[in-house]
Amino acid sequence: MRSKSKQVLLLWLEGFREACSLHRVVILCLRSRKLLLRTGQCFLLNGLIFLGSLGVFKWFIDPSLQWILPDQCSPLTSQEFCSYGGFYAFLRGGLLQLFYVFWFYPLYMLSFILSNIWYNDIAKHGFEAIEISDLNSAEALRQGEALASLNMANAERPSGLGGVMIGIGEQVYSILLLTFFFLEVCVVGVIPYIGKILNFLLLSWMYAYYCYEYKWNFSGISLKKRLDFFQSNWAFFAGFGSPCVLAIFFLSPLVSGALMAILFPLFVLTATGSGPEKLIGAPRRTWKCAGLGKLPIFYIADTLSMLALSIFRLESPHEN
């Protein structure tokens, strides 16, 4: 038991350290001008415009409205002016809501849509920068050897139309799985006493999976292999996702969304440049153990996804 606990802690710390290896982002951006451009666009939209707008609102607009339309009277204010305090509070609240409805919420949606498009480009350019670079050939060889066992999935997938259909099916299932897992994360957060702890843990796994999914997509690793590898090495990925969650866990939804939109591509690039297969295998060789065992992280999401797909299959013939 003590040996297992040490293994969990070491793998968690290894994952945490990998996520914090942000120097890889600088190296990859220096190798690829396209990557630097996309990353800069992401920082401009989410950092300067989105997060900057929230800062201007909090530190300038809101205090100014508090001063112009106060809801409490100072001793020097006339009684006639004070009689409008309730109306001023209502008017100020309405103006604040207008800012949210016509600026922050549309900006949030724009950021969400563009960022998701840019994230894929960032991961692709980062992956290409690693592949074509000969400045770090030893690292490329190390990752190539580590991914060899996982890339065996490519041989199992048929070519032609059959392979395309399997790929589409995997994408549909993956979307359903991650959607239900996200809902599970939200529901777990309202559980008394232990809800916040479970929410933090599930969020860590969710962000870690998102970060590595880009790399696995470009590596051609099948969905089954990804899920098996992820759930078999849950301690490492819990550690990798922890810095992502720590950065936003105690912030308001809009601020956390803006900050995560800035940080997420950095963690994606960190995941793209990392080799978790060898990092995870090192402790096993040191302790001569088989690993921690598979943890069914996606069990609930998988059950709901299969249920949704079975309902869809039953309804389709009936409609025809």
Swiss-Prot record:
The record lists the organism as: Arabidopsis thaliana
A Pfam family annotated for this chain is EI24
**Glycan attachment residues as annotated in the record:** 217
What the record says about family reads: Belongs to the EI24 (TC 9.B.7) family.
Its subcellular locations are:
Membrane
Q: How does it sit in the membrane?
A: Multi-pass membrane protein
The UniProt keywords, alphabetically, are: Glycoprotein, Membrane, Transmembrane, Transmembrane helix
Q: GO cellular component terms?
A: membrane
Q: Which residues cross the membrane?
A: 41-61, 94-114, 175-195, 227-247, 248-268, 292-312
Its main subcellular localisation, reduced to a broad class, is: membrane
Coiled coil start-end: none
Write down what this protein is called: Protein EI24 homolog
Which superkingdom does the taxonomy of this entry point to?
Eukaryota
